[in-house]
Amino acid sequence: MKIAIGIGELSGDIFAANLIKYIRKNYPNIEIIGITGPNSFKQGLASKFNISSLSVRGYFDVIFNLQSILKFRNNFLNFLLNEKPDIYLGIDAPDFNFFIERKLKEKGIKTYHMVCPSVWAWRANRIRKFKKTFDYLFSIFDHEKKFLKLHKFKNFSYVGHPLAQDIPLLPNVNKSKKILNINHKGKIIGLLPGSRPSEVVWNTDVLFKATVLLSKRYKNLLFLVPVTSKNNLSFIQKKLFETKIKNIQLIHGHSHDILNISDIAIIASGTATLEAVFFKTPMVVYYKLSSLSHFLFKFLLKSKYISLPNILSNKALVSELIHKQATPENIAIEASKLIDDVSHRQQLIKEFKDIHKRHRLNTNELICNQLFQ
């Protein structure tokens, strides 16, 4: 049997890598092909199709790169039609994967999609297209069960979140400190401006300016920044030089270890906010994007919140600073509240534990039981 896996961004690559590892251990005769990334490559998925070709963010970033994205998509589809996999699993990236899934489904190939599109936040009418697009959906957030049933979509199962199973309920902080060789005695603050190059460009400057303000107020702070690529590294180093901050360390990768040892984190909204929840790290969420993208974002958004901690708890657990609200001053103010208020941090940790438990299932086993039944 042959399975093809399609991913479009780093978070999907992490999910794919975990699933590939499980398949190779428990279903060694399954052949795996598809799009690769840094994590899935380590699990043996070598491919000429790489997620680096799809790393754009925002409506207008997509428009500016549309020709190259469409070329990549069409080449990948032709590759799959030639390979004729028994199963196609699209992981997230719905605007990319839905096209692939629909074309393969028309050819009689069994199609699955992992990660329900955020239909509960915007474009709820997409649910009507699910049946024509793929055969089965794997939902990873528990609040989606009620929403999908309400809209009478039945071909799905809730499988929990892959990271909730990978990350212990009580992570080993000392182990992460040893891995990072960090012995700092003061407060540690994780800074996560995003993983895609466009995210880093939009979010780094305001973040570093906020650290200048925080460093003036608090002594002995250490800021840690996980860097995911050489392109991101060069841009972040440039901004670091411009702001002349001395108490920031850039670390290649290790975002999980950084979140684990951080007293608080300041995060550009995205999957990293959920990772912070699973590591029980209190956070401030901010999000910078172009004015045009922000206009469309506000027009389409139906959810009251944008960050996963708030969406999953259905309340304002963490501060959200969006677009023009995401100033260095506002970020520093919200971060200061977390630093100063121990009881608030403890309450957040309690709430995060509850979210973690609700999403901690045998995800890969549940997926494979459905794929290979």
Task: Describe the role of every protein-language-model region.
Residues M1-Q373:
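Nucleotide-activated sugar donor-binding and catalytic core shared by glycosyltransferases
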